[in-house]
Structure formats: C-alpha cells, structure tokens
Amino acid sequence: MLIDRLAGAVPAHAWPTITVAGAVMVVVLLMRYLDYDKKVEVPVIGPGGRFTKWLGAIRNVWYAREAIHEVANGQHGKLGFQIPTMTRMDVFICDRALTREYYSLDEDHMSFRAVMSEEFQFKWLLPGQHHDVHRIPNSVIAKALSWQRTRASKADDPFFREFSAEFLYGFQEEMRAFTGCGNKSRLPFFSHAGDHTSGNSGWIAAPCFPLALKVIARLTTKSLFGEPLCRNPKFLDMCCEFGDAVPRDAMILRCFPDFIRPLLARFLAAPRGVKELQTVVLNEITSRRNSREKNPMKDLLDFSINWIDEHSADGWEDWHIADMMTNTVFAALHTSSQLVTHTLFELATRPEYVVPLREEIRQCFALYGNGTKAAIDAMHKMDSFIKETQRCNPLDASALARLVLKPYTFSNGLHVPKGSFIFTPNSPLFEDEQFYEDAKRFDGLRFARMRDDPKRKSDSPMTATSEYSMHFGIGRHACPGRYMVSDEVKLVMVHLLLHYDFAMANFGPRPKNMAFGKFILPDMQAKVWLRKSKDAGNTARVDPGAPDGVASEPS
C-alpha cells in the first residue's frame, strides 16, 4: 500500500522529528483557527486575549450557561458582554432598549435564518434550508399552522377530534411496545421494553424521553402529513432519527474549520436521513397529486401543495415542499418531547399538584365536552404548570439569535461589524425577582393566578411571548408552531393524569438536567414509573382521544 511504502522510505530516526513537527503544525492550525478577533466593544467574560481566549472557549463547552448567569446577575456591566466559543465570540446585548432595536431589524441587517443555518449547519446537513438559497418562506408554514389552528377551534370541524384520537392510538401503541406486546422500533433506545417492577405493585418503568419522543412524533406527523405516514413505524423512526441527528451532527461540524466540513458531512447521519425523508415525502406528494380531486385538504402537506400550485410562476416545485417539511420535522420533535419529559419529571416529584389538575380536567370536560379544543384551552392550571416547568427548565440560556449581515451601529454608538453573532440573555430572566415573584421557587399555579392580574393576563398563557418570556422567541420570528406544542403537551399530560399514577423510578428525586454549553436537557435515560390509577378507576373516565361523552378505558 502507498502508506506502507511511504513509511518504509522514511528513516526510523526521522520519525520523532516528524511527529514533533506534525504536533506543532496541528497546534499552529488550531491556534490560527481559534485566533478570531474581538469585534465588539463590550467586556469579554473569562480569558479574552489573543492566545488565551481558547481557554475560555474550552470552559464554555460545558459552562457557558454559568458564565451567562454570572453576568446577568450583576457581576458585570448591564450594556452587554461576550463569551469566547470554539469558533467565535458570542455577543450578548443586555440593555432592553438595544435588544428591541436589534430584533426589530429586517433580515437584510440581522438575520435569524442565517444564524440558524450556521448553528445547525444547514449548508451540509439540510442544504435546501440554508439561508441564502431559494426556499419557501417561513410565512407559508406559519399560514398553514394558522389554518390548522382555526380548524382546531371550530366545534364542527373534525380536525382536533382526529388529532386527539391519534394521540390516544399512538400512546396505546407505544405502551404496548414498551411492555413487550407490540412492534419493536429499530431505534436502539426504543429496542427494550419497559421494565415491570418487582412485586405485585402494578408499576411499569418506562424510559420517559423515548416514550415522549415517539408519541410526539406521531402527533407531529399527523399534523404535517396525516395518514398513512403518521402510522408508518419505519417513517416514524426515520423522523426520530433525523430529529436527533441534526443537532448532534451540527455540533460535530462546528468543531472543525469550514474546509473540512463538506468531507466530514459525508460520514454523518443527518445528510442520509434528509434524503430518506425527502424521498418518502416526495412519493406522498406524487400520490396525492394523482388523487387530489377525490380528497379534501386535510393537513399541512395538502396546504403546501396548494400553495406552490398557486405560486408556480415563481419557480416553486415539489422538492421545495419536501425541504420545508423535513426542516419542520427537525424543529418540532425535540422541543415538544423535552417539554413533556420535563413536565412529567416535575409532576412525578410534586404529587400535591395531581389532585387539583385532575379536578380541573374533569370540570373542563364537563363544561366544554370531552376532549374538545375548548376544554383543553380552558385548563388554566394545566397550562400554568407546563409554563412553570418551562420557566424552571429553559432549554437555551440565550434568545433572539441573529447574525449581522451588514455593519450596524446602535443608537448609543455601539458598533457591531458584519459576521457578529448577537444574542440576549434568556434563562437569567426567569430568576429575576423583577419579573417573577419568589423566582427561585417552583410554583405550578403561578401563571393561573397571573390571569387575575389585568396588567399581566395577556402574558400568562403558555403560548404568550414577551421580553421576559422568550421560550418561543418574540416579534416576527416568534415560533408559529407554539400552539401545536401546547396542544401536544397538554394531550399527553391530560391522558396520563386521568388514567395513571406516576412517580420517578424507585420513588427517587427529580433527575438532574444535563448541561452542555448554553443548553440544558432532561435526563434522556431516566425512567418514570406508571401504574393504572385507582382514582381514575372509581370515576366516570373520559379521555381526550375519545368521542364526546364516551368514556374510554385506560390503555
């Protein structure tokens, strides 16, 4: 082989010199790669010198969140700051007036799309969604979701009834799989059944996040694609694998220089997953085009097909839909699944909330109908508990990410050059007594009581956005899918509360969150104990997935 010949041609005594020279070259290249400039005149948190900031960058791989909280808690100036990462300086604007100034700018100046393209490496992992390519505007999926939300609110429209029924079917299927009675998934962390605990207690220990992910995948694909795809086990696994691969592969690519990324991407899972998903979606589009006159518009895929037909003169084609839908799958799955997991962890370790939440569910079903959208929307205590869970377990320590595409000077004279990455602190706001009384304490009914305050009533729903609650962004880039997230999480929790008792495995404490950089994630391996509820068994049981007025047996 060529390598063997080259090795044989090099004298043995030369190898130590070559090894040292190679190591020096690697260090020089690494230092050159990390030798980015401090471009914005705000303080650097931690080492910020030309050849020392990489020490801070390495620390921030694990502790960026702590650094952001230290600054926001008043240890540094209130205007802004920056922290070194492995590839750049992340600039944080703390001043509220300046924050409003930058997030209100148009995409040509400060781009949300561009920063998402960089964070998730769309150029290599999802090329059709890269910020500078011809792609279906975000406003289209927003309009589609608004259309679906309107359908859900109409009592005579079957959409929400079918959506909640799909949840019940999906939950029962996944529980059968976890208890060894159903089809096994090809995914490694779904391949094992839930464990039956010892004795005759009736408890089953199920992996919480995998169960949440599969159920949310069924609901999301129901909304996006409808049947038969939302009931296709292989397609569901593909969606889950892809949703997991994109953030993981993006993190890997960001650790390497630009010139290495296209080569490395060939060996990653996300590019393969994108092709698999898009092939399935394109085949479904072709099938629907062949039978469109026979079928009404039922889901977001139908809406998108109609949209590109109406705008075909602008060069839109079916593969643009496949790109958009694939991106939506990635964006939707983990957000909802992590929130379900966090919420279940909180409720399993706070049993004092179980009775009032169960009572509210039954009252709302009695007033507005079993499983109706009106009943789900009337559950203010449930909404509050989920939002408080979000407040205490925010995914990202930052919010309102933007990439500066044109140099910009703020009204106070602060200049940010092209290429700067701009953020504002997010999670520190949830610990600020200025916005949340007794902010360090978990209060599951905090936002339910807030509805009685005329000044804060509009900020109390889970889907509301404000400058001190930016889970879903704010302004023109606020997440249009937040209403679907709310419905999905509530359907899961309503069903569990009506039909199950639950606790953490071995009646232990809440599993600790996992921190990485600016992010925290729930423990993906933790198990929750589930048991058919005796309390539910002694009452007339109702279910979000059953027809109005019909009691359903627990799965």
Swiss-Prot record:
Keyword Iron among UniProt keywords: yes
Membrane topology label: Single-pass membrane protein
Predominant place of localization: membrane
A matching Pfam family: p450
UniProt-listed InterPro entries: Cyt_P450 (IPR001128), Cyt_P450_CS (IPR017972), Cyt_P450_E_grp-IV (IPR002403), Cyt_P450_sf (IPR036396)
PROSITE patterns found in the cross-reference section: CYTOCHROME_P450 (PS00086)
Protein known as: Cytochrome P450 monooxygeanse terQ
Residues the entry annotates as binding heme: 479
GO MF terms, alphabetically ordered: heme binding; iron ion binding; monooxygenase activity; oxidoreductase activity, acting on paired donors, with incorporation or reduction of molecular oxygen
Keyword tags: Heme, Iron, Membrane, Metal-binding, Monooxygenase, Oxidoreductase, Transmembrane, Transmembrane helix
GO biological process, one term: secondary metabolic process
Cofactors that this protein relies on: heme
Gene3D superfamilies: Cytochrome P450
Location within or outside the cell: Membrane
E.C. no: 1.-.-.-
Primary role: Cytochrome P450 monooxygeanse; part of the gene cluster that mediates the biosynthesis of terpendoles, indole-diterpene (IDT) mycotoxins including terpendole I, terpendole K, terpendole C, as well as the kinesin Eg5 inhibitor terpendole E. TerQ is a C11-hydroxylating enzyme that converts paspalline into terpendole E. Terpendoles biosynthesis begins with the synthesis of geranylgeranyl diphosphate (GGPP) by a yet unidentified GGPP synthase.
A GO cellular component entry from the record: membrane
Residue segments, region Disordered: 535-555
Disruption phenotype: Impairs the production of terpendole E and leads to the accumulation of paspaline and 13-desoxypaxilline.
Transmembrane stretches, start-end: 10-30
Family: Belongs to the cytochrome P450 family.
UniProt gene name: terQ
SUPFAM superfamilies: Cytochrome P450
Pathway noted in the entry: Secondary metabolite biosynthesis
